[in-house]
Amino acid sequence: MKTFKGIASAKDMRVAIVGSCFNGPIADALVSGAAQTFLELGGAEDRLTIVRVPGAFEIPCTLKKLLTSGIEYHAIVACGVLIKGETTHYDHIADQVSARISELSVEYNLPITFSIITAPCVDSAWQRAGIKGSHLGVSGMRTALEMADLFKKL
């Protein structure tokens, strides 16, 4: 019996981060955490592409642009922040963005991690950005690299 498992190493990996700018300081923390993790895990700066988009809704079309650009990425990390408000806008955006990211990952057979915070309030969002507890940008990059390594082995 063979068992396959990836390791979180950025050595020789080409990775992109697509990060939204809306909810700026929290989104910035996710992107910088993901980028720093890539470098700490042996990645080279010239093999990391960071693309900033206005909001989470723009992430899927930007992912598609990267996937069809002719550059071979081993993984992509999608970073953003959605905070629930008083209207249903949050629900529509969160549902559509998560569904499309998943579809693109399967369609292009490429690990695309969902490091998009969906939170009921700003305080909860900060908690998921590493202020108190886990850091979704860091864990998203680690998962992306682990999956990219696994895909190389399969």
Swiss-Prot record:
Keywords: Riboflavin biosynthesis, Transferase
Binding residues annotated for 5-amino-6-(D-ribitylamino)uracil, in chain numbering: 22, 56-58, 81-83, 114
Any single biological process term in GO: riboflavin biosynthetic process
SUPFAM superfamilies: Lumazine synthase
Identification of the protein by name: 6,7-dimethyl-8-ribityllumazine synthase
Binding sites annotated in the UniProt record for (2S)-2-hydroxy-3-oxobutyl phosphate: 86-87, 128
Domain of life: Bacteria
Native organism: Chlamydia abortus (strain DSM 27085 / S26/3) (Chlamydophila abortus)
Associated pathway: Cofactor biosynthesis; riboflavin biosynthesis; riboflavin from 2-hydroxy-3-oxobutyl phosphate and 5-amino-6-(D-ribitylamino)uracil: step 1/2
This protein's record includes keyword Magnesium: no
Pfam family, one: DMRL_synthase
Similarity-based family: Belongs to the DMRL synthase family.
Molecular function via GO: 6,7-dimethyl-8-ribityllumazine synthase activity
E.C. code: 2.5.1.78
Matches recorded under InterPro entries: LS, LS/RS, LS/RS_sf
Described function: Catalyzes the formation of 6,7-dimethyl-8-ribityllumazine by condensation of 5-amino-6-(D-ribitylamino)uracil with 3,4-dihydroxy-2-butanone 4-phosphate. This is the penultimate step in the biosynthesis of riboflavin.
